[in-house]
Amino acid sequence: MKYCTESLILILAVIGCISAAINFKCPKGTAEEKHQKEIYDLVQRINRPLIPQFKEPNFPTSFLIKGKDPKEFFQAIGHLPKKEVFSLFDERHWDEAMTAYEYLYEAETLDDFIDIAKILYLHLNEDMFYYVFSFAVLYRKDTRNVRLPQVHDVYPDKFLKTDIINKIKQANYQGKQHPVIDATKEFHDLRNPVSYLHYFLEDIGMNSHHYHWHVMNSALRKAYPTEGEKKFYRKGELFYHMHHQMLNRYELERLSNGLPRCPTFENWDDPIAEGYASHLAVDRTGYRYTFRPDNLHVRDLPELTKDNMRVWRDRIFDAATSCSVLRENGSFVKICRTRFYGGLNILGNLIESNLRSINRMFYGNIHCYAHVIAARVTDPDGKYGQGNGVMYDVATSARDPLFYQWHKFLDHFFYEHLTKLPTNHLFHLQNPDVSITNLEIISNGRKNEIHTFWENDIMEISKGHSFTLNSDAKVKIQHLQHEKFEIHLTVQNDKGEDTDLFVRIFLLPLEDEESHELSLEEMVRMAVDIEKRVIPAKPGSNDIVISSRSIGAPANKFFGSFEERYISEDCNFHSHCGWPNYLLVPKGSSQGTPFAFVVMLTLAEDDFTPNMDDTCFCADSWSHCGSLFIQYPENVEMGFPFQPIIECTKEEFFALPNIAKQEVIIKFTGETKDSPLVIQLENDS
């Protein structure tokens, strides 16, 4: 346990800083040092096979006083074998995971919570345990000051390919201390054009974000009577918005690399044209994520046929286009009566098939089983005992190009629904009190040109994994990065008083892969939400500068050691959900790819919930991740002003005084630079 203890001293000091530095208005965590130590020690055991087991604690007295039966407890858990991968997409895992979560969430005290967690750890699949434990820590009020390692800290072998894991293991066998392994080399093949997108598809930060989004916005969360009801009021819409944004970022990377827009996988009798090999395995268990060759066909599963999914598809399409959703009691709810987001939320819950779906029996589980049926395409009935593909696991699914093809199919339901809503006319979009008189993007002294490049970074893997038995390891990885840029706005406030403005910043493509100009509809359907924030404006002219470094989750949230990652002056609470800052803009091309920054201003009093306590939501990326304990802070559609459909021409839209467009060139330099972590490592060696 020495390797846990050394790390623990530092992390407890950091957590103490966090607790002292913030005066929470949101629920303030009450975990003391002893609780934090026990929680951290418990998580450190996950995916580390040689840590000695602890004695199973007795059930808490409060558990027994409430009349809960330990026999029922043990009957409800332990069904998913220890060596399997837990899948949030596989409904067969839901009952066990949900039961475990409820035991944790409803524990009366922190001591009870920890005792129940220890019991669960000994009997639950470890993968499932990490998910439900993270979920409970996130939403219990008394654990608000507890930090857990991120999924790539706990399962680095779900993010690093087997050849890298084997090199780490070999270095450990040879007795090397603190080995540094180079994982910056990428394999590309002209026969597989998507291999040139692996820098995005297999990015550690992006895949970690996707996993933790599904923790923060879990499909398993029921409607609890207090904070849960507020928090999940717009969960279905957020499911659509975040995955729509992931799809759009992928589209921009395809355009940057001269590839056509992402195809839609909608005819399930057609072969899956693009294969995918992840080269991933969970080293401790030997579980390998199955390779999918090109042109395989989706086949029926023993528990689910394609015809079942077609029935669900047709029912959801009818609900989206008829504006009428069937409840379980046989009545209908209308979802197209107003411009606002209620219908998107109901539809999103239906499509994700989460526990807030109005009628899961009728509308089924199309999103989750799209993942499952795709993941089991090589061995659908288990005849050969093959593992599942990466689409099965939330931590790995966004690596597969099929993920985006499936989500583009699901995206179509939402688009059809949006076409049935009252459109956004010019009077919905304009605001007579504010205007933008100038917009410029400044990067390294250049106007309206942003350079991107490769950046080497360090992922640290702690001691105790099956491949780091004798020493921790550092892995040099490579990710996309951009030069720092600033968004310079000149804003005219004609309200006659100090005013808070709500600023929305988007990045839009201007041309397709063949350099043809895109229509307004095509542009806005691929719009990427860069930032939303409140800015103060005095009467008259205001010069406002927004730095790219203040947007999204910084690289040091993902890389370096877990302990050092949280030594910062900003002791804000982190849910681990947040789009990586280094992926803020697409790669662009060597000759330069044209895009447009679009900025819209409205009054914060109209569009943003006032008197918000920003410790309640993920300050890094609330637009993508939502909020903790409170309602989503934006008061209109999450995709506004591009949702619902805009009823005007391109010229009319960009001529609105409170909207500004600035064309920019994003140019990939081909350079490779070292991050501060790499520079520090080289200086220390």
From Swiss-Prot:
Glycosylation sites: N329
InterPro entries assigned: Di-copper_centre_dom_sf, Hemocyanin/hexamerin, Hemocyanin/hexamerin_mid_dom, Hemocyanin_C, Hemocyanin_C_sf, Hemocyanin_N, Hemocyanin_N_sf, Ig_E-set
Key word Iron-sulfur present: no
Intrachain disulfide bonds: C577-C625
Signal peptide (residue range): 1-20
Positions with a binding annotation for Cu cation B: H367, H371, H407
Keywords noted in UniProt: Copper, Disulfide bond, Glycoprotein, Metal-binding, Oxygen transport, Secreted, Signal, Transport
GO molecular function: metal ion binding; oxidoreductase activity; oxygen carrier activity
Binding residues for Cu cation A: H210, H214, H243
Pfam family, one: Hemocyanin_M
Places the protein is found: Secreted, Extracellular space
Assigned protein family: Belongs to the tyrosinase family. Hemocyanin subfamily.
Protein name in UniProt: Hemocyanin subunit X
Source organism of the structure: Scutigera coleoptrata (House centipede)
